[in-house]
Amino acid sequence: MIDKFLHFDFISKGVIFIETVQTIPQEIADLFQTKGSLLKVEKGTHIFQEGERAEHIFLIKSGSVQISKETESGKELTIRICGKNCLIGESLMFCKFTSHSSTAKAIEASEIYLIHNDLLESFIEDQPSLMMDYLKWIQTENVKNQSRLRDLVLHGKKGALFSTLIRLANTYGEFRTDKEVYIPIAFTNTELANLCATSREMVNRMLSDMRKSNIISVNKGHITIHDLTLLKSEIECENCPLAICRID
């Protein structure tokens, strides 16, 4: 299993890029490429929807995919923003449930591999060492989810927004200094609210206050965090490994 979760590349103009790197076992990624089918999906296309029969597992080759759940009243909670090399639809592997428990939608044009559940399960079952690597990866995902849930619940609405911005920075950010980071994915305030499990109006007010205090700036939905250290101190950041403090 690839245990290097984050890689820093120094390029011109003093910008430091953080790459999203592969965290699933290489053998599984190779199987998608050799035995899977490649889908090209446009922005706004649903890859699968909550309640649909789950027959395939997906690996993102390029692009970004939003994983979300919706209540009966229509309120949406965004669970993950997944990018290159992320596995989606995997929660039902080795499981008796046959329907998707969430919805996956492309938030930009994407290329996605898909493979049938049975093929991937048998491939993992036949290789005990790969099964161990897969279990380690699943456990990392569980800890990541627990950490995000803790931040959403324990630190109030401001803490939920701050932790979401920190996770977006760790996952997709382009670091210009050790404190300042640009998030290249554009978000509306509604989309940020869905990530924070709060209302758009509340996010509007908090972002406005942060802009006035020069903690962030926003240009056409792209957020630049000017003081990441301040955000971390406000939520009593526990300095989790970067493999855990992520949004994907």
Give a label for each model feature.
Residues 28-29, 80-143:
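Cyclic-nucleotide recognition modules
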Residues 47-52:
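Short phosphate-coordinating micro-motif centered on Lys-Gly-acidic
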